[in-house]
Amino acid sequence: MAESPGCCSVWARCLHCLYSCHWRKCPRERMQTSKCDCIWFGLLFLTFLLSLSWLYIGLVLLNDLHNFNEFLFRRWGHWMDWSLAFLLVISLLVTYASLLLVLALLLRLCRQPLHLHSLHKVLLLLIMLLVAAGLVGLDIQWQQEWHSLRVSLQATAPFLHIGAAAGIALLAWPVADTFYRIHRRGPKILLLLLFFGVVLVIYLAPLCISSPCIMEPRDLPPKPGLVGHRGAPMLAPENTLMSLRKTAECGATVFETDVMVSSDGVPFLMHDEHLSRTTNVASVFPTRITAHSSDFSWTELKRLNAGSWFLERRPFWGAKPLAGPDQKEAESQTVPALEELLEEAAALNLSIMFDLRRPPQNHTYYDTFVIQTLETVLNARVPQAMVFWLPDEDRANVQRRAPGMRQIYGRQGGNRTERPQFLNLPYQDLPLLDIKALHKDNVSVNLFVVNKPWLFSLLWCAGVDSVTTNDCQLLQQMRYPIWLITPQTYLIIWVITNCVSTMLLLWTFLLQRRFVKKRGKTGLETAVLLTRINNFMME
C-alpha cells in the first residue's frame, strides 16, 4: 500500500536510519511499506512478546536457579553461579527487541517506511531461536518449572493486568493510525475486531484471577515457620555444624539435611553422590574423585575439609562474603556425623528433618541403611520428637521402634493406613492443596524450596505452616507480605484501570482521526496551490 512521503524532519530521518541503516534520504518510490515489511514487523512484535515472556520466566526461575547451577556442576565439574549471566542475557534480548519495536512504532506514526535492515532481521531470528531453545530445554529438563509459573501468576496476575491495560493503550496509537489509513471497509472491520477482541480479554481477565493475597487483613494467617535447607547455605557451608548454628540464629525451627551411610556404617551429612562439590576430595583422594560418597569410610571422611569450597566459589549470587571469625570457622568445617548433628541440634533446640540417600548396590549396608540410621538416632539419646522422619523406606518398622518420632510424608505417599499429620511437598503443588481443609484435619504443610520474598508472601497468604528455604536471613526479616489488598480495593483498582485505559483508547482514536482530517486538508490545499502554479506557468 503506497504511502505519502510523510514527515521529513531530522528526527524522523534519524529514526529511519536506526531502523533500516540507510543514512541517505529514501527516493520517493521507496517511501512505502511493502507486505514483506509488514510481515517483518509482525515477527518483530512476536519476538518482543517472546523475549518479554522469557524475562518473566527467568525472574520466576531465579527462585530455583541454584538447582540449575548444581545440575551443570554435575555435568561439567565446574562451578559457576549463572544467575547474573542469565539475567544479563535476557535483559539484553528484551532491551534490543523493545527498542526496535519502539523505533518501528514511531516510524509508523511519522509515516516513514518500515524497511528493516538485514542485520536486524538476522538478530530477530536468532532471538526467536534462542528463546525457543530455552523453552524446549525447560520443557525437557525441568517440566516442574511450568508449575512454578502457574504458582507465580497467583502473585503477579493483578499487576500483569494493569501492565497489559497500559500496553494496549500505547498500542492503540499505531492501530488507530493504520485504521484511518486503510480505505477498504473489510480490512478496517477485521482490524477493529482483532484489536478490541484483545482489549476485551484484557479487561475481563480479573474475572479469572485468583490470589490468596486478595483478602481482608484480619484474615491473614500466621507467618510460616522457617526450615533451613541444608542449614543456612547462604551464610555457611551447607550440611555442616556451622550451618546448623546459623540456622538457629536465623530464627528457623527445623534443620533440613541429607544423610548417607559410610562404608563402615556411620551415617553422615552429604547431599551429592560425589564429594567434589562440597569437599576437598580432589586434593586428599585425587584418584577417587568420581567415587560415590558412601564408598568412603568414616575415617576417610573425617580427613576432608567441608568449608573451604564455600569461600572459593560463593555458591549464591548476592550473598555477603564471610569475614573475620565466620571466615575462620568456615575454613575449619568438616563432614559431620548424624550423631554429632543430633546432639548439637538438641542443644540449640532445633528439630531435624532429613532425606536418606540409598547407597550403591555393592555397599555393605545397601539393604540395612535405614536400620543403621535409625539405630544412630536412637543411640543419640535425644528426644525422638525433635526428629522429622521423611524416608518412606521401612517406615512401618521405624514407627514401631521409634513411636515418638514425627512422621512427615512427601508426594510419593507413605503409610496408607494412617492419616498423615505432616506433609512435605514442593511449592509447585500449592494449586493442588486445600490448606484450610488440611488444617481442619490437623495436618501441617511444609513447602520447599522457597527463597524469594514474592513466593514466601504468596505462601504466607495461603496459610502454609512452614517453608524450606536457602535464604532464612532474608525471610526472617519479613514482617508482612509484600502485598495484600482487600477484595473491595482490588475491585476498585480493576474498574479504574479499565476506565482509564478505555478513555485513552477513545482519545487516541479521536486524536488520530483529527490528524488524518488535518493532513487531508493540508494535502488538498497543497494540490490546489500546485495546480494554480502549473496553470500560471503554462499561460
From Swiss-Prot:
Give the EC number.
3.1.4.43
Organism ancestry: Eukaryota, Metazoa, Chordata, Craniata, Vertebrata
For the GP-PDE domain, which residue ranges apply?
Answer: 224-479
Q: Name one GO molecular function term.
A: metal ion binding
* Pfam families per the UniProt record, alphabetical: GDPD, GDPD_2
Per the record, membrane topology reads: Multi-pass membrane protein
Name its cellular compartments: Cell membrane; Cytoplasm; Cytoplasm, Cytoskeleton
* CDD domains reported in the protein's UniProt record: GDPD_GDE3
Q: Which residues lie on this side of the membrane: Cytoplasmic?
A: 1-38, 107-121, 176-188, 512-539
**Any keyword NAD?**
no
Any idea what this protein is called?
Answer: Glycerophosphoinositol inositolphosphodiesterase GDPD2
GO cellular component labels: actin filament; cytoplasm; lamellipodium; plasma membrane
Q: Which UniProt keywords apply?
A: Cell membrane, Cytoplasm, Cytoskeleton, Glycoprotein, Hydrolase, Membrane, Metal-binding, Transmembrane, Transmembrane helix
Which spans are transmembrane here? 39-59, 86-106, 122-142, 155-175, 189-209, 491-511
Q: What does this protein do?
A: Has glycerophosphoinositol inositolphosphodiesterase activity and specifically hydrolyzes glycerophosphoinositol, with no activity for other substrates such as glycerophosphoinositol 4-phosphate, glycerophosphocholine, glycerophosphoethanolamine, and glycerophosphoserine. Accelerates the program of osteoblast differentiation and growth. May play a role in remodeling of the actin cytoskeleton.
Q: Where does a divalent metal cation bind?
A: 256, 258, 271
Q: Name the catalysed reactions.
A: sn-glycero-3-phospho-1D-myo-inositol + H2O = 1D-myo-inositol 1-phosphate + glycerol + H(+)
* Keyword S-adenosyl-L-methionine appears in the UniProt entry: no
Q: Extract the InterPro entries matched here.
A: GP_PDE_dom, PLC-like_Pdiesterase_TIM-brl
* Highest taxon of source: Eukaryota
Q: What PANTHER family does this protein map onto?
A: GLYCEROPHOSPHOINOSITOL INOSITOLPHOSPHODIESTERASE GDPD2, GLYCEROPHOSPHORYL DIESTER PHOSPHODIESTERASE
The record's similarity note reads: Belongs to the glycerophosphoryl diester phosphodiesterase family.
